[in-house]
């Protein structure tokens, strides 16, 4: 199906977009907290169930039946990934601003309202939540630092600027970013391509309420690869520089060995040293071929129109949005 649909005029001030994966134990409390918020201009909740294997679907249907604010539940046909699910939510959100939260309750909804007000006051297109203390496992924090380092290097991002999954964007930016239908979206890279009106705000980060994170090391590596190759040819240029450096080193070594041979001096190199050098150069060649293959593979998959997401069904509550005008 076509993922891009006509975007209606904003009917609420703020949309909360929450991607869900096996969130049956956490989503109810989070939704009730969001419903109780006082948002001038009204707010809505968009839940995107990204192929959960537990009872998330049934819990969402129950929340929809008792919704106190406008609510939309979207079902993906299978698990496509967090960034894919967020883009699906952005395409259906009707707010003038959109905040996306994690499904585990670690992003307090009250902090989302602070982030929204900060974006309004500063005239920002994108406002990231900067966690004072992150309540993730050590390997997740290490992975986040690696992602920050790679985006500093590969993307047009101010060095050291903090990126996080807790962000507030304008409807304008969400609409522009949601126009991307590629199968390997990386939201922060897309946002940096659209606008430079970006800021951050220090926010609280809670401990996970229940369950375990849906992010595995494999998923984190896939995210790294998307950040690494989707928005820059810098890795290929680095491979070229590395190849030139090794070629120069090889010619230099050849000159040294030839000089030693001519003088009849120098160490007696055997098969061990020869095989070690061969393995080093072969390993470098395979790494470069793998990098080129990653680019070509992603191009092949994109050309063959692998879907970014497939929507199985949508359910919307019939409660009208608040009529109070935004301040």
What do these predicted regions represent?
Residues 32-42:
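Short, acidic, metal-binding catalytic loop of nucleotide-sugar glycosyltransferases
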Residues 49-58, 105-106:
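A conserved acidic beta->alpha catalytic loop
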């Amino acid at each position: 199906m076509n993922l891009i649909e006509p975007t209606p005029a904003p009917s609420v001030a703020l949309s909360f977009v929450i991607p869900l994966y096996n969130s049956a134990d956490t989503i109810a409390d989070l939704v009730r907290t969001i419903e109780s918020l006082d948002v001038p201009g009204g707010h809505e909740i968009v839940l995107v169930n990204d192929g959960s294997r537990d009872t998330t679907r049934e819990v969402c249907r129950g929340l929809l039946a008792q919704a106190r604010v406008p609510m939309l539940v979207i079902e993906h046909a299978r698990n496509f990934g967090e960034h894919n699910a967020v883009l699906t939510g952005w395409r259906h959100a009707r707010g003038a601003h959109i905040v996306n939260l994690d499904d585990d309750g670690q992003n307090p909804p009250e902090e989302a309202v602070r982030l929204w007000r900060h974006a309004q006051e500063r005239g920002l297109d994108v406002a990231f939540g900067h966690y004072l203390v992150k309540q993730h496992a050590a390997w997740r924090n290490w992975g986040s630092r690696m992602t920050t380092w790679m985006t500093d290097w590969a993307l047009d991002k101010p060095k050291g600027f903090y990126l996080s999954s807790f962000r507030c964007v304008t409807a304008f930016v969400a609409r522009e970013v949601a126009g991307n239908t590629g199968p390997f979206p990386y939201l922060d890279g897309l946002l940096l391509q659209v606008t430079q009106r970006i800021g951050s705000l220090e926010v609280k980060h809670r401990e996970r309420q229940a369950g375990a994170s849906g992010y595995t090391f494999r998923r984190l590596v896939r995210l790294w690869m998307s950040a690494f190759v989707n928005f820059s040819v810098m890795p290929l240029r680095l491979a070229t520089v590395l190849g030139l450096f090794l070629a120069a080193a090889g010619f230099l070594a050849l000159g040294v060995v030839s000089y030693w041979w001519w003088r009849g001096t120098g160490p007696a190199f055997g098969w061990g040293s020869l095989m070690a050098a061969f393995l080093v150069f072969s390993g470098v060649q395979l790494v470069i071929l793998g990098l080129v293959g990653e680019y070509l593979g992603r191009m092949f998959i994109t050309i063959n129109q692998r879907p970014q997401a497939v929507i199985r069904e949508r359910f919307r509550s019939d409660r009208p949005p608040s009529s109070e005008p935004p301040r």
